């Protein structure tokens, strides 16, 4: 049921708000992005491609972890993991994009 709820959240456009989607794989969970619990002014959703394979295709995920920022239901920025399967992006960079700075 949890996977279905997550899929429905990502299937519907998010209007009038920001949504930050963090996508990873279960085998790479130790490399979840460290800033997820820190960013503000956005809803945060987490998903794992091994539990929700449709996410990989729908959002064209080629590397994990991946962060996707949506505003008014449209993707405005994407950050993808590097070859070491870690996401090297500063919290301030993500927060500035959320806040339109």
Q: What are the language-model segments listed below?
A:
Residues 15-43:
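Local sequence-structure signature of Cys/Sec-based thiol-disulfide redox active-site neighborhoods
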Residues 42-51:
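A short beta-strand-loop structural module common to alpha/beta enzyme folds
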Residues 59-69:
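Structural micro-motif
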Residues 34-37, 60-61, 82-83:
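Short, glycine/charged-enriched secondary-structure capping and boundary segments
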Residues 69-101:
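Non-catalytic, surface beta->alpha helical segment in thiol-disulfide oxidoreductase systems
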Residues 55:
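Short conserved loop adjoining the S-adenosyl-L-methionine
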Residues 3-14:
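Sec-dependent N-terminal signal peptides
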Residues 47-48, 59, 86-90:
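Extracytoplasmic/periplasmic, Sec-exported soluble proteins
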